């Protein structure tokens, strides 16, 4: 009799577990269908690499790009659906999260053709490179939809581990090894700081890990204004700051930009900021709802330091990649203005709009740098002197992207900054907006210095790198040029027709 009862209990427990697994797979699993497409693409890459020879290399690029495009398509089909929480509260799907996932997928889709010729010329391992890019993309997408502290920690670790491996991909290069070591050590330290902040938040809320439940727990325990929350806020801000790389958490950025392969830098420069921005908006806006004044002050300090230090130090740089590293530090200061403004006054909409333009401007600039580096073997700014005389198309493309980064009208960067600063002004962030305007003028100065060098380099200034430059054909099947053309067009034309982009961004608000 006892055995019969135990057997019935075992059958009931097994059935319950099976039904729960079935529900997770077929119901909750449908909410992560775009991520599942990328996972399937990863499996296909491994299968083809293990069963084929070097002749099937184009298939690897095709599968990677196709899986990313299919994931974007699946994401667009899910647009405007009702917000849903799945996997026992670990993951949330809504328009706000999905627009950031779309931006990450867009970055990866543009970065793969940008990397093709570079990988072939440097004889890097192709399969592993594509695997790391897709895995980092999956980690970034899960981070955008993360709804609890555990997922918010695990997802960026997935992204970070792939980032460390990508930054050290050219292992024979001493600079790459140095960059990887700094990136790894500082990344590990920032992760431990972030977890420590989560532990304070977990304890203060009475043991809650879901973001909304943390708010309810803080209300129930009357701890929403306690010193523990302030400590948690400081540690979490420092941890997230490493991913965003604002000053003073920027020390790793110039070395990693200079030492890593240029396509990797292009990938990391946009995807890490998009994923970290998505995470920061949710963490600051939900668990720290009652501490808005405190985190506003912290982010204002970070934004001011980033805009001033990033743009001032960029003036002194002689390497194009280091200059863009400090420029990106200044750019994230502008993005932080949108995070501070928040849901009110279209702060998030302006941040998303500027992020979209920043992706096209930054990737377009890096595409030009990759192309120039492959044809000349140099990354020094002075070696760009007189490039217009050898390759007008490349010189004009680089000039347009740099001018758009600086925010000159009528390019997309100008309208993105204008919308962002207008929202900040409407929210009363007058000092931040003034600092942003002044530092934008500074950035225009060092961008124009490079453009002047491109266009008017005198014969005595032209280095052997440009004298021996191989002129590109007018019609080229080069995948880097394809990415460059797409990014240059996206950096110029969308600024003229801003209303549809702003309307889509406004639809993503909570």
Curated annotation (Swiss-Prot):
* Spans traversing the lipid bilayer: 24-44, 57-77, 99-119, 124-144, 149-169, 183-203, 227-247, 295-315, 323-343, 354-374, 395-415, 418-438, 484-504
Write the record's keywords in alphabetical order, separated by commas.
Chloroplast, Membrane, NAD, NADP, Plastid, Plastoquinone, Quinone, Thylakoid, Translocase, Transmembrane, Transmembrane helix, Transport
Entry keyword annotation includes Ribosomal protein: no
What is a biological process (GO) this protein takes part in?
ATP synthesis coupled electron transport
Q: Name one Pfam family in it.
A: Ndh2_N
One of the record's GO cellular component terms: chloroplast thylakoid membrane
Broad enzyme group: translocase
Report the subcellular localization.
Plastid, Chloroplast thylakoid membrane
> Could you tell me the EC number(s) of this protein?
7.1.1.-
Membrane topology reported for the UniProt record: Multi-pass membrane protein
InterPro entries given in the database record: NADH-Q_OxRdtase_suN/2, ND/Mrp_TM, Ndh2_N
Q: Which domain of life is it from?
A: Eukaryota
Catalytic activity reported: a plastoquinone + NADH + (n+1) H(+)(in) = a plastoquinol + NAD(+) + n H(+)(out); a plastoquinone + NADPH + (n+1) H(+)(in) = a plastoquinol + NADP(+) + n H(+)(out)
Any one Gene Ontology MF annotation carried by this entry is: NADH dehydrogenase (ubiquinone) activity
Instruction: Quote the subunit structure annotation.
Output: NDH is composed of at least 16 different subunits, 5 of which are encoded in the nucleus.
Q: What does this protein do?
A: NDH shuttles electrons from NAD(P)H:plastoquinone, via FMN and iron-sulfur (Fe-S) centers, to quinones in the photosynthetic chain and possibly in a chloroplast respiratory chain. The immediate electron acceptor for the enzyme in this species is believed to be plastoquinone. Couples the redox reaction to proton translocation, and thus conserves the redox energy in a proton gradient.
According to its UniProt record, which protein family does this protein belong to?
Belongs to the complex I subunit 2 family.
Which HAMAP family is this protein grouped with? NDH1_NuoN_1
Please give the name of this protein: NAD(P)H-quinone oxidoreductase subunit 2 A, chloroplastic
């Amino acid at each position: 009799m006892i055995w019969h009862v135990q057997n019935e209990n075992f059958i009931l427990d097994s059935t319950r577990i099976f039904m729960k697994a079935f529900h997770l797979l077929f119901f909750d699993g449908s909410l992560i269908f775009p991520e599942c497409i990328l996972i399937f693409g990863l499996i296909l890459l491994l299968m083809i690499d293990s069963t084929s020879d070097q002749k099937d290399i184009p298939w690897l690029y095709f599968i990677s790009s196709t899986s990313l495009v299919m994931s974007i398509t699946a994401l667009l089909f899910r647009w405007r659906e009702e917000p849903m929480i799945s996997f026992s509260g670990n993951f949330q799907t809504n328009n706000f999260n999905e627009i950031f996932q779309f931006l990450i997928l867009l970055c990866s889709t543009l970065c793969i053709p940008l990397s093709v010729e570079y990988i072939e010329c440097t004889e890097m391992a192709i399969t592993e490179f594509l695997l790391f890019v897709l895995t980092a993309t999956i980690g970034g997408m899960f981070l955008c939809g993360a709804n609890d502290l555990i997922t918010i920690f695990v997802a960026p670790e997935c992204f970070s581990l792939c980032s460390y491996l990508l930054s050290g991909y050219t292992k024979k290069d001493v600079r790459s090894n140095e960059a990887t070591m700094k990136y790894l050590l500082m990344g590990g330290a920032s992760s431990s700081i972030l977890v420590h902040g989560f532990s304070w938040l977990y304890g203060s809320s009475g043991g809650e890990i879901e973001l909304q439940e943390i708010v309810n727990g803080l209300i129930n325990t009357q701890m929403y204004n306690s010193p523990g929350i302030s400590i948690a806020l400081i540690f979490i801000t420092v941890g997230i700051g490493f991913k965003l790389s604002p000053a003073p958490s920027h020390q790793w950025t110039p070395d990693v930009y200079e030492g890593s392969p240029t396509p990797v830098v292009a990938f990391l420069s946009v995807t890490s900021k998009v994923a970290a921005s998505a995470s920061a908006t949710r963490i600051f806006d939900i668990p720290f709802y009652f501490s808005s004044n405190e985190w506003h002050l912290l982010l204002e300090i970070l934004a001011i330091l980033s805009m001033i230090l990033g743009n001032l130090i960029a003036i002194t740089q002689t390497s194009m990649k280091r200059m863009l590293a400090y420029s990106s530090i200044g750019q994230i200061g502008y993005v932080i203005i949108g995070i501070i403004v928040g849901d009110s006054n279209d702060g998030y909409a302006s941040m998303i709009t500027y992020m979209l333009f920043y992706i096209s401007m930054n990737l377009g600039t890096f595409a030009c740098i990759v192309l120039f580096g492959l044809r000349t073997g140099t990354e020094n700014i002075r070696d760009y002197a007189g490039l217009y005389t050898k390759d007008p198309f490349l010189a004009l493309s680089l000039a347009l992207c740099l001018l758009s980064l600086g925010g000159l009208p009528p390019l997309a960067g100008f309208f993105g900054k204008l919308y962002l600063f207008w929202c900040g002004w409407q929210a009363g962030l007058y000092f931040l907006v003034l600092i942003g305007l002044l530092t934008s003028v500074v950035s225009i100065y060092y961008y124009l210095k490079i453009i002047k060098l491109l266009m008017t380099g005198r014969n005595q200034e032209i280095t052997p790198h440009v004298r021996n430059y191989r002129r590109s054909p007018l019609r080229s099947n080069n995948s880097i040029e394809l990415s460059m053309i797409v990014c240059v067009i996206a950096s110029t034309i969308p600024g003229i027709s801003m209303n549809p982009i702003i309307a889509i961004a406004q639809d993503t608000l909570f």
